[in-house]
């Protein structure tokens, strides 16, 4: 197996027919973002030992473009030829598929007393031509994808530490690190439920949210089934929903 860069991939999205991913090494305090063609075979890049020596100049092997990130990427999404991401303690950025910067914004501000790190970006959602940026503390901003103009802002209205957000159009499913999950629609919480762990994957099937949590498959408005292996991803095949687990 080829490894273009000797670090774990933290985020990956499809953009303009290619893969855009981020690689992070916390020990060496470095991060990369690169675009890889889906038509070409992966190449093997530098080793971890070589990276320690040339940590500032080593790039992702075989990439169309690769950039040294000035801080750790904490969220990544894409739509068409645009890539939207957030960097820890820095801001929110939008680039095109050639890595040209289109716009940038500062992080969301928390008013008054708030828990530590609550203004950090917890997730990014895309709804039509708008970007919804969620802070870990539950604030959100709606931003124009085209020019980065802030259109509106709001709040989930509960104490939380947002870990991920799934959406089906304007219907959002918010997952908190303490196991709470909320369906959020039309600016208000419609369902709140405490799960055994954070949400690994979720898809709205047209009537309800199908959720994979810690060794548990859940219908948000219904029951749940426990499982031995860890669920990773929901897959629909021949009108049947299945769960891909960590055993393949």
PLM regions: where:
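Short beta-strand elements that form the blades of beta-propeller/WD-repeat-like
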Residues: 1, 11-12, 17-27, 82-86, ...
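Aromatic (tryptophan-biased) beta-strands that constitute blades/sheets of beta-rich domains
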Residues: 2-5, 40-69, 101-109, 151-155, ...
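Repeated scaffold domains used in trafficking and secretory/extracellular systems
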Residues: 4-18, 62-63, 68-77, 112-125, ...
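Eukaryotic tandem repeat interaction scaffolds
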Residues: 119-123, 127-212
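Solenoidal tandem-repeat scaffolds enriched in leucines and small polar residues
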Residues: 53-144
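A short local loop/turn or secondary-structure capping micro-motif enriched for an aromatic residue
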Residues: 10, 29-30, 93-94, 103, ...
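Structural motif
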Residues: 27-43, 90-95, 137-143, 178-184, ...
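A broadly used, surface-exposed interaction patch
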Residues: 6-56
């Amino acid at each position: 197996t080829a490894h273009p860069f000797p670090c774990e991939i933290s985020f990956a999205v499809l953009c303009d027919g290619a893969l855009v991913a981020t690689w992070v090494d916390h020990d060496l305090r470095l991060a990369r973002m690169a675009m890889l063609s889906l038509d070409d075979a992966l190449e093997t890049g530098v080793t971890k030992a070589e990276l320690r020596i040339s940590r500032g100049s080593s790039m992702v092997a075989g990439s169309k473009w690769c950039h040294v990130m000035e801080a750790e990427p904490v969220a990544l999404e894409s739509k068409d030829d645009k890539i939207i991401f957030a960097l820890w303690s820095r801001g929110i950025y939008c680039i095109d598929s050639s890595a040209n910067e289109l716009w940038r914004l500062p992080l969301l501000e928390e008013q008054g007393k708030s828990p530590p790190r609550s203004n950090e970006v917890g997730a990014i959602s895309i709804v039509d031509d708008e970007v919804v940026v969620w802070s870990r503390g539950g604030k959100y901003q709606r931003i124009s994808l085209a020019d980065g103009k802030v259109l509106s802002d709001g709040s989930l209205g509960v104490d939380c530490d947002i870990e991920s957000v799934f959406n089906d159009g304007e219907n959002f499913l918010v997952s908190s690190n303490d196991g709470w999950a909320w369906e959020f629609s039309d600016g208000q919480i419609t369902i709140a439920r405490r799960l055994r762990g954070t949400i690994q994957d979720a898809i709205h099937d047209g009537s309800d949210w199908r959720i994979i949590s810690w060794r548990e498959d859940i219908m948000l408005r219904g029951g749940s089934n426990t499982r031995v292996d860890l669920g990773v991803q929901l897959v629909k095949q021949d009108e049947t929903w299945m769960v891909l687990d960590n055993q393949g």
